[in-house]
């Protein structure tokens, strides 16, 4: 499933690349290319962790139909569109949230999907904050990985295949 998910993402990125080129040629915005190799390496590590967190979260949500088959598409839509897009920093930077809410959101796995890797790439998160962010995202990676295996094993026990 992971390779299927990755191939879908690569296809989406290829289409987005052409859209990006067209918009760039029309608007000519300034582009920022990170020069610091350590920041680039930290960014790549944060991207790999983000990909795995995203996969684990969607795998867990996609397992909901084991217990409630009628919720297959709805639960997936709710999590991907509402929760992930909203809380990951894809729609707006998490910095604009009030301090208390921002701290709560930063303790969840969602910001480590988009907001954190982007801030690392821009060089806004370095040093101790970078290590803290990578540690928190790694902890979420382990928690979600264990949860995924648990949900999958429990789901297979209750699975009932019916049909012709």
Model-identified regions with their sequence ranges:
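Junction motif at the cytosolic side of a transmembrane helix
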Residues: 121-124, 132-164
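Helix-loop-helix units of permease transmembrane domains in multi-pass membrane transporters
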Residues: 1-9
């Amino acid at each position: 499933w992971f390779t299927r998910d990755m191939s879908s993402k690569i296809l989406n990125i290829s289409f987005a690349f052409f859209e990006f080129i067209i918009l760039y040629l029309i608007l000519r915005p300034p582009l920022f290319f990170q020069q610091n190799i350590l920041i680039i390496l930290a960014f790549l590590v944060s991207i790999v962790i983000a990909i795995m967190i995203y996969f684990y979260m969607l795998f867990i949500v996609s397992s909901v139909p084991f217990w409630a088959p009628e919720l297959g598409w709805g639960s997936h839509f709710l999590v991907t569109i509402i929760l992930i897009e909203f809380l990951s920093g894809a729609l707006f930077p998490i910095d604009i949230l009030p301090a208390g809410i921002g701290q709560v959101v930063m303790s969840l796995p969602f910001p480590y999907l988009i907001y954190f890797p982007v801030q690392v790439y821009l060089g806004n998160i370095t040093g101790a904050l970078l290590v803290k962010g990578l540690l928190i995202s790694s902890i979420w990676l382990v928690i979600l990985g264990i949860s995924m295996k648990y949900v999958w094993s429990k789901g297979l026990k209750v699975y009932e295949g019916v049909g012709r």
